[in-house]
Design a protein with these regions (language model features):
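Alpha-helical/coil-rich non-catalytic "connector" segments in signaling and regulatory proteins
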Residues: 1-132
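Conserved small/polar residues in nucleotide/adenosyl-binding loops
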Residues: 133-138
Length: 138
């Protein structure tokens, strides 16, 4: 089971993500949403997401600030930025926070699926680390 949190101030984006994740990944993913930076940090405290898709520009605190706050209590969540802003400063800040990928809007269904598949694969590797010494021995 993977816990996915999607933060975006556009309701249509939240519904698109939920719909694509639900129809593609079924019961293997639980998806929660938030429309503001403050709401996403509060939801992250109780929901404990494995994967977070974060918009940059939202009411209240922005996505970068929200990621910083979430990192204080959830050091293992995988962050994916989904934003219409491709400014270098935002990308650099996101990279500094350890974002897995910076996706630009508009985002297609195929890109959502690809990003979720990538995130699930990374989460699986965290949950079931491979013993490289064991592999080298064989």
């Amino acid at each position: 089971m993977y816990r996915i949190l999607v933060a975006d101030d556009e309701g249509i984006m939240l519904e698109a993500f939920k719909s694509v994740i639900s129809s593609t990944f079924g019961d293997s993913c639980i998806t929660e949403t938030a429309k503001t930076g403050r709401a996403v940090t509060e939801k992250a405290e109780t929901f404990h997401p494995d994967i977070v898709f974060m918009d940059i520009h939202m009411p209240g605190i922005n996505g970068i600030q929200a990621m910083r706050e979430i990192r204080k209590f959830n050091t293992t969540a995988l962050f994916y930025v989904v934003s219409a802003y491709d400014k270098f400063d935002y990308a650099k800040e996101a990279i500094d926070l350890g974002v897995e990928r910076y996706l630009t809007k508009p985002i297609s269904k195929a890109k959502i699926i690809s990003a979720v598949e990538e995130a699930i694969e990374k989460e699986d590797k965290k949950r079931n680390p491979v013993s490289y010494t064991h592999l080298r021995a064989h």
